[in-house]
Amino acid sequence: MINKSYKHWMIVFFMCCLAASSIGLCTNAIGVFYTPVAKSLKVLKGTFAMHATLSTLATALTLLKISKVIKKYSYKKVLLIGVILSSGATWLMSYSTSVYLFYILGILRGIGVGIYGMVPITVVITNWFDKKHGLATSLALSFSGLSGAIFSPLLSSWITCYGWQMTYRFMAICILVLVLPALIVPWNIDPRKEHLLPYGYQNRKETTKVQNNKIKLLTISFLCMCLFTLLHTSITGISQHLSGVAVSIHLSVTIGATFMSFTMIGNISTKLLIGFLSDLLSPIKAVIMMILTNCF
């Protein structure tokens, strides 16, 4: 079986599209709606932004189970359900007149994002890549930042020209279109089912022996990792509010969207750099280097 082919990089392209749709559009770019929709519904921005919090919570709960689901069922069918939920919920938001309806639709969109977001993307790349795994992962996930950088000012401009209702419909169409390549082109989550091996895979003797099938979660290292993940992920939510911050200091919504684009550009460059360093050194060393860089 072949361990290097164009199909491996086609899979990366599909994952780029999924990241752009699920994380880029549904997570990184939604902040441009906070001010205009909250004003239209006559509620506080924080009250409206709660729908994004509920969406993220729904995504987190979905991610806990999705790895088992994609092993049991055809991922293309699962992917179709995910994109219908995310794009459909976004489309229905354009007709919403109550903040509570936004909460419900936000949860549905969050479930959809979880179905084809971060975990499925990394699972697919892990299955398809042995060597250059870090590069493939960072390349795919960087498109979440690229999508956010492109669509934040674009959505802001559409809101100004067409209103937030029509912009939600445009956004729903974009969410669906980005996923279409992965839905239309035949591919499998396991390369061996296509008579291929993971990229760069070589037969090697297994030297690691499993001592115990039980995994201990209540360890200091695991708890520290949970705390680190919580703290570093909480920072990403700030970018969604930059548009509202810009308006509060008498700048235009477009300027706020530009601020969001700059954060996404940093997102892209960091993911590409950490992917390169992971392959060159190791994932742990790469993360430590990036943390030290951020400290300065």
Tell me the role of every PLM-derived stretch.
Residues 107-142:
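Cytoplasmic helix-loop-helix junction between adjacent transmembrane helices
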Residues 187-211:
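Flexible cytoplasmic inter-helical loops of multi-pass small-molecule transporters
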Residues 62-74, 270-282:
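Helix-to-loop junctions at the C-terminal end of transmembrane segments
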Residues 27-34, 217-274:
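Extracytoplasmic gate region of multi-pass secondary transporters
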Residues 10-48, 62-66, 151-152, 231-244:
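Extracytoplasmic
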Residues 20, 89, 100-116, 230:
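Hydrophobic core of transmembrane alpha-helices in multi-pass small-molecule transporters
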Residues 77-91, 285-296:
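Structural signature of the two symmetry-related core transmembrane helices
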Residues 139-191:
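Helix-loop-helix hairpin linking two adjacent transmembrane segments in secondary transporters
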